[in-house]
């Protein structure tokens, strides 16, 4: 059943020059800016008694605003006692270090057992925030840092920060192949035309930019540090595969394990057992959505990636004299 929403207020003189959707988001902080924008486009907002369907319309201050809308009841998700590795928490945000094998949001094939279910158990009031405060995601088997909003105002501002590319996210990865230099992949990404669960570089896709630099060379693999400008689904995985250096272990965009000639049994065994993309969100930097203070967190790579890198490093040292690019 839909919930009726009827709101009235007067635009403050201090809001002179703001976009209508921005002004209303400040006036009604219990509702996200994206929701308010939908109401404006749906002609649910009156300004001085007249319908206004332009979110970008500038306000002058003093206008009488009325909203008459409905909110469809969202799917109800159950709280579940799933441990969360909390790196930081205050009244407005939570930063977690997500493990592998944990989906962020319920969906097809994963109706529960997700970060969202864990958040509902850990902090029940987060149920009042759209999507339980989740503003960005990590793939199921990508580990590392992600930020969650505990309130609607915090969520609104974090989403705006993401859109303005003010949140810095850096990753560590291990890619297949010897890479000679860092660089940037600036290629649009969209759904794969035939494999609907896959993404692909496509000229009609959404803009996507990934910067990468080399941290360490191995014989036939490369350890990378990457920074996202955008946050498309599977972005790093798709971009690295596009430049013919897919991530080790990637079950979708990678290839079969390729140990170098003469590799030890330990190397071969570790590589074959590594059954996820070698990708970890290692650094997160943002401006706090309420205080505006710049904050930064780091999460070391998990043990499975540590072991992978150690066997690759040992193999490189053992066969250094055979490498032709040194």
UniProtKB/Swiss-Prot annotation:
GO terms for biological process: enzyme-directed rRNA pseudouridine synthesis. The keyword Isomerase applies. Its main location: cytoplasm. The active site is at residue 139. GO terms for molecular function: 23S rRNA pseudouridine(1911/1915/1917) synthase activity; RNA binding. It is found in: Cytoplasm. Transmembrane segments: none annotated. It catalyses: uridine(1911/1915/1917) in 23S rRNA = pseudouridine(1911/1915/1917) in 23S rRNA. SUPFAM superfamilies: Alpha-L RNA-binding motif, Pseudouridine synthase. Pfam families: PseudoU_synth_2, S4. PROSITE patterns: PSI_RLU, S4. One of its GO terms (cellular component) is cytoplasm. Responsible for synthesis of pseudouridine from uracil at positions 1911, 1915 and 1917 in 23S ribosomal RNA. This is Ribosomal large subunit pseudouridine synthase D. It comes from Escherichia coli O6:H1 (strain CFT073 / ATCC 700928 / UPEC).
